[in-house]
From Swiss-Prot:
Naturally occurring in which organism (per UniProt): Drosophila buzzatii (Fruit fly)
Name of the gene: Adh2
Binding site for NAD(+): 10-33
GO MF assignments: alcohol dehydrogenase (NAD+) activity
Family classification: Belongs to the short-chain dehydrogenases/reductases (SDR) family.
InterPro entries tied to this protein: ADH_Drosophila-type (IPR002425), NAD(P)-bd_dom_sf (IPR036291), Sc_DH/Rdtase_CS (IPR020904), SDR_fam (IPR002347)
Name of the molecule in the record: Alcohol dehydrogenase 2
PANTHER family (UniProt xref): 15-HYDROXYPROSTAGLANDIN DEHYDROGENASE [NAD(+)], ALCOHOL DEHYDROGENASE-RELATED
UniProt keyword annotations, A-Z: NAD, Oxidoreductase
Keyword Endoplasmic reticulum: no
Protein's GO biological process: alcohol metabolic process
């Protein structure tokens, strides 16, 4: 998918990886970039607007833990204004295994609910035009950081959901792929809580190993958007972009 002249909604587009990705997207010249985030950041929005004045950048406050009906109402406002949306990026995430319910609500349920809400506008069975979803998951969805099992499980769930969305594309007209960053230098990983304090130094230990910058991750994210491969499981690690081949151990047969 060429980003130029497209309409894009980016949930959590002002976070660490999110904001650098928003910058890279704006440089690529979409028609509209709509950022949905929990906390407004006027300076960040102003920076994005200045980066490419030809791109219309707008912001709406959004908490992914709200009911689907509220999300649908917000999306209707956006669709009424833009008429069409080409790409939805689901990027909300927290890393704090003290907050079990919230971790699941933000990292998994929020992705499911936002996706469910946009189907009302995209699903070809309802006369919709289809669309593309990019879900930010994590390499911990492949193999857990076992000291943060709640976070890792929430990302594995989001990855599984995304893989299913891709297989449903012939029915819905909506394609999907996952973006799975490795350890990236963001505020998310500088300090966080392990489950039941099983490893108080988990963040410190992770950062002793090679990482990548948010800019490296963002640049590869844009490459994945441009590749636009339904069902792709993209690993963005150590500054590299790699498509992962998922090993099938069981098949429902339906």
């Amino acid at each position: 998918m060429a980003i130029a002249n497209k309409n894009i909604i980016f949930v959590a587009g002002l976070g660490g990886i999110g904001f650098d990705t928003s910058r890279e997207i704006v440089k690529s010249g979409p028609k509209n970039l709509v950022i949905l985030d929990r906390i407004e950041n006027p300076a960040a929005i102003a920076e994005l607007k200045a980066l490419n004045p030809k791109v219309t950048v707008t912001f709406y406050p959004y908490d992914v833990t709200v009911p689907v009906a509220e999300t649908t109402k917000l999306l209707k406002t956006i669709f009424d204004k833009l008429k069409t949306v080409d790409l939805l990026i689901n990027g909300a995430g927290i890393l704090d295994d003290y907050q079990i319910e919230r971790t699941i609500a933000v990292n998994f349920t929020g992705t499911v609910n936002t996706t469910t809400a946009i189907m009302a506008f995209w699903d070809k069975r309802k006369g919709g035009p289809g669309g593309v979803i990019a879900n930010i998951c994590s390499v911990t969805g492949f193999n857990a950081i076992y000291q943060v099992p709640v976070y890792s499980a929430s990302k594995a769930a989001a990855l599984s959901f995304t893989n299913s969305l891709a297989k449903l594309a012939p029915i819905t007209g909506v394609t999907a792929y996952s973006i799975n960053p490795g350890i990236t230098k963001t505020t998310l990983v500088h300090k966080f809580n392990s489950w039941l304090d099983v490893e108080p130094r988990v963040a410190e230990l992770l950062l002793e190993h090679p990482t990548q910058t948010t800019l490296q991750c963002a640049q590869n994210f844009v490459k994945a958007i441009e590749a636009n491969q339904n069902g792709a499981i993209w690993k963005l690690d150590l500054g590299r972009l790699e498509a992962i081949e998922w090993t099938k151990h069981w098949d429902s047969g339906i």
